[in-house]
Amino acid sequence: MNIENFDLSDLEGVGPVTKKKLEDSGVHSMMDLVVRGPVELGEISSMSSEICEKIVTIARKRLAETGAITKDFASGSEIYKRRQSIGMITTGTDALDALLGGGIETQAITEVFGEFGSGKTQFCHTMCVTTQKPKEEGGLGGGVMYIDTEGTFRPERVVTIAKANNMDPAKLLDGIIVARAYNSSHQVLILEEAGKTIQEENIKLIISDSTTGLFRSEYLGRGTLASRQQKLGRYIRLLARIAETYNCAVLATNQVSSSPDSFFGDPTRPVGGNVVGHASTYRIYFRKGGKNKRVAKIIDSPHHPASEAVFELGERGVQDTEEHLKQLDKEAKKAEKEAAKPVKKSKAKAKADGPEGVDATPAIEPEGIDTAAAEPEDIGTIVSESADAGEPADPELE
């Protein structure tokens, strides 16, 4: 039985009346209960905190028993085994895939920040295509939910990228669910009600572009900073919970600002402060690199080393540079050349085998002649005497 299809009424203490309250509040499954949590559940359903805590606890235990979510306590081996189910979505470029260790990871938030024109939205459009590729081609064969807060989603761009990847544009567009957010409250609401759509549409990637734009424009001045961060934190936590409970990836773009107290180095800083920084699993910095090139740098990661990758924007969306492709071709030819070389024998084996072209098998000695005792001239004398005596010559010596 699929855990995602467990009915809410299967839970102890959830009758028809409670079930209706939950569904009216946008809670349709046990996963939704775990994602929301007891505090938020009480706010949206008007149920008492005791009932909410009881329902969420029962749902969490039920899901943990079936292996849908991690138990409260688990060994390192269990966590390692669970992480084997984590998927990777290719970025469409060898350089970025190598930088990220295979691509965008599920059950995690990958934050991409950078100034305008650095390629963030183009990257999002590219991921709309690569996510829907089959697993053998680096995708997950699932849909995409695109939360558009700036009105920058362009289906025409998806069509161009799809054609460049030899994929059906119409089918790809049908696999993208776009939600246009007009204010920060609407942005949070979209995510709160996303659970049912994620299950029904087999969503494997959630794109939030941009994550902080609406919060930044609505909450101005230091006096509103606390309220903004509290609301933004709730949105980011929802993203993290959804990514883990539904085993999907989250790609969140972020705006930047300049730090006035930075006298050396790059003054560019991502917006959102520690609230966004602590919630993001991976932080990638996009910057312009001259002409059509862009540079991606890992700023924060639990296991990736700090490194950079160069890519460019083109017909395929984000793509490898010509220099990188030439380098890959050069390395491939070198590998083929090395594989074609004959295997060299070790000195010991070569000595045992003897010189090349010479039979190393010991020669058969003439029968009846002690070559070890006789000198070369003695052997010649013996042969001569045998011939003079009228005896047939040994055929081995002729």
From Swiss-Prot:
Family affiliation: Belongs to the eukaryotic RecA-like protein family.
UniProt KW keywords: ATP-binding, DNA damage, DNA recombination, DNA-binding, Nucleotide-binding
PANTHER family per record: MEIOTIC RECOMBINATION PROTEIN DMC1_LIM15 HOMOLOG (PTHR22942:SF30), RECA/RAD51/RADA DNA STRAND-PAIRING FAMILY MEMBER (PTHR22942)
Binding residues for ATP: G114, E115, F116, G117, S118, G119, K120, T121
Name of this protein: DNA repair and recombination protein RadA
Region (Disordered): 320-398
Alphabetical list of SUPFAM superfamilies matching this protein: P-loop containing nucleoside triphosphate hydrolases (SSF52540), Rad51 N-terminal domain-like (SSF47794)
Disulfide bonds: none
GO biological process, one term: DNA recombination
GO molecular function: ATP binding; ATP hydrolysis activity; ATP-dependent DNA damage sensor activity; damaged DNA binding
Ranges of Basic and acidic residues composition bias in the record: 320-341
Gene: radA
Role according to the record: Involved in DNA repair and in homologous recombination. Binds and assemble on single-stranded DNA to form a nucleoprotein filament. Hydrolyzes ATP in a ssDNA-dependent manner and promotes DNA strand exchange between homologous DNA molecules.
HAMAP family: RadA_arch (MF_00348)
